[in-house]
Structure formats: C-alpha cells, structure tokens
C-alpha cells in the first residue's frame, strides 16, 4: 500500500504567502509532471517533517490526496532551512503506470558477520554507497536492494554489477558503463603481516 499524505490546493503564491503558510504550520509545495499542469499545494509541516526522516518515504510511491482527489507521486525535492528544523518547500512528481521512473533506493546489507574476510581474517567492511538509482515501472519499484556480503574476502570489492536486482529493475549507471564500487573489505593495518608471521613461527 502506498504511503498516504493529505494536502490542500492553494491559490496564493510568492514569498509573503508562503511565509504566512509556514507561520500557520503549513508547508508550501508543488505537484508537477505526468502530463498535467503544476499544482501548488500546502501540507501539514509537522506530519511531513517526521515522514521525511524515514528512508521509505524518499524511495516509495506516495498517494497524495489534494482536496479529495488522489494522485500517485514521487518525492523529488526538499528545501530545508539552513539552521532551523524546518522544511521550506517540497516538490512531488506525478507518475504514470506505463512510464519508467528513476528513483534512488536504499541498499540493505546482510551477512557481513559471516563474510570470510571478516570472520576469518578480522577485516572490516566499508560501504562506499548506501543508496543507488534504479529504473523500473512503478509497479516494480522495490523498497530497497538487498546486498549479500557473505562471500567477501580480504581486499575484495563489491561493484554495482554484482548486485542482484529484482525482476524488471535496471541500474541506469550500468547502462552507461559506470560500474562503481559499493562495498570494500578492508584489512586492519598490519593484519596480513601478523597472520603471515604467526604461520611462520608456528
């Protein structure tokens, strides 16, 4: 089920109108794209502020109810106050079920504790990336991509091309030939030398 949010349409624009909305605890925003016209909206600031703290809100299809009319959207941009805990503006993009969407989804790492490089060699896994941009139809959008680290050995590098993707999901960067590292297994300084010395002394 999509995450649901409620909004009101708004007719007043500009800095002054937006400031008055914020004083009232409302958050100005806009819905655009999907073949429709841009729709200025306002939302409850407190509700959106806490929703924005969750990864799933940033990487999921959202159902937004504007004056009783529901649309499916993606979160596209958030403008934060430079030093206050306040959202200044928020942008949503309409989606169409027959068109692919590009979304950054979180990477969910598993089995790091049983990786040979960790369990047997005392190494440490470093995550170069914690999210990745994917392309798919809205119906195929996953909440996250699972990254299995169970086979990582000392000094190994897990690349984007090593990720196991759900069906009908692509990584645009790979289509451009951009195969970036995702995780690396780093040995502690002097770890390998100590192991070799131990074997020799034995």
Curated annotation (Swiss-Prot):
CDD domains: Ribosomal_L25_TL5_CTC. GO terms for biological process: translation. The keyword Ligase does not apply. One of its GO terms (cellular component) is cytosolic large ribosomal subunit. The keyword Transport does not apply. Keywords: Ribonucleoprotein, Ribosomal protein, RNA-binding, rRNA-binding. Coiled coil: none annotated. It comes from the Bacteria. InterPro entries: Rbsml_bL25/Gln-tRNA_synth_N (IPR020056), Ribosomal_bL25/Gln-tRNA_synth (IPR011035), Ribosomal_bL25_b-dom (IPR020057), Ribosomal_bL25_C (IPR037121), Ribosomal_bL25_long (IPR001021), Ribosomal_bL25_short (IPR020055), Ribosomal_L25_dom (IPR029751), Ribosomal_uL5_bac-type (IPR020930). One of its GO terms (molecular function) is structural constituent of ribosome. Gene3D superfamilies: Ribosomal protein L25, beta domain, Ribosomal Protein L25, Chain P. Belongs to the bacterial ribosomal protein bL25 family. CTC subfamily. Part of the 50S ribosomal subunit; part of the 5S rRNA/L5/L18/L25 subcomplex. Contacts the 5S rRNA. Binds to the 5S rRNA independently of L5 and L18. This is one of the proteins that binds to the 5S RNA in the ribosome where it forms part of the central protuberance. This is Large ribosomal subunit protein bL25. It comes from Nitrosomonas eutropha (strain DSM 101675 / C91 / Nm57).
């Amino acid at each position: 089920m999509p995450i649901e949010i409620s909004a009101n349409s708004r007719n007043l624009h500009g800095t002054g109108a937006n400031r008055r909305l914020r004083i009232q605890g409302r958050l100005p925003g806009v819905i655009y794209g999907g073949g429709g016209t841009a729709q200025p909206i306002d939302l409850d600031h407190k509700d959106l502020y806490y929703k924005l703290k969750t990864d799933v809100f940033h990487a999921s299809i959202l159902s937004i109810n504007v004056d009783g009319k529901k649309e499916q959207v993606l979160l596209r941009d958030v403008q934060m106050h430079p030093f206050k805990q306040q959202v200044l503006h928020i942008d949503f993009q309409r989606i169409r079920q027959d068109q692919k969407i590009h979304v950054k989804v979180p990477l969910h790492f598993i089995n790091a504790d049983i990786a040979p490089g960790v369990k047997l060699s005392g190494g440490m896994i470093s995550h170069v990336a914690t999210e990745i941009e994917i392309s798919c139809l809205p119906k195929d959008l996953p909440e996250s991509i699972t990254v299995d680290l169970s086979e990582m050995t000392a000094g190994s590098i897990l690349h984007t091309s090593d990720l196991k993707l759900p069906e009908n999901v692509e990584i645009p960067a790979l289509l451009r030939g951009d195969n970036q590292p995702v995780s690396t297994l780093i040995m502690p300084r002097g770890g390998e030398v100590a192991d070799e010395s131990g074997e020799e002394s034995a």
